[in-house]
Amino acid sequence: MTETDSRKSVRSGGRGKKDTDTVQPLFDSFRHAFDGILTGLGERNMKIHCLMAVLVVAFGFILRISIMEWCICLVLFGLIMALELVNTAIEAVVDLVTHEYRPLAKAAKDTAAGAVLIASIMAAITGLIIFIPRLLAFFHL
């Protein structure tokens, strides 16, 4: 069984597909991707990231950040949320493989979480660089 065959089997709930059905329609690919996003949105940390994004957008409108600053914020939103989805996927796969304590399982989960943390810290620093001068000007300080 090839990797593609096993992916089709997993996505179809183990029912398998005919050998003649070799090309998955594009909308099915998008549906699976949106299912993954919805799964991720159920995670506590993703909810926190979404709340922070809403706050940044609100402050962005209030403080009238520039187009370039909007672009930076949007790229950072996408990066953090994508990393959070990858982190969720890695955690799910590790949990699928073992529920016992294993050093490699811990390393996989911790490393994925660390990637999200680094991106989040850098996004927060970038946000401070963008928003602090505008907040000071807004309050005439």
Predicted feature locations:
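Hydrophobic alpha-helical transmembrane segments
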Residues: M1-A89, V97, Y101-P103, A115-L141
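Membrane-interface alpha-helices at helix entry/exit sites of multi-pass transporters
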Residues: A105-T111
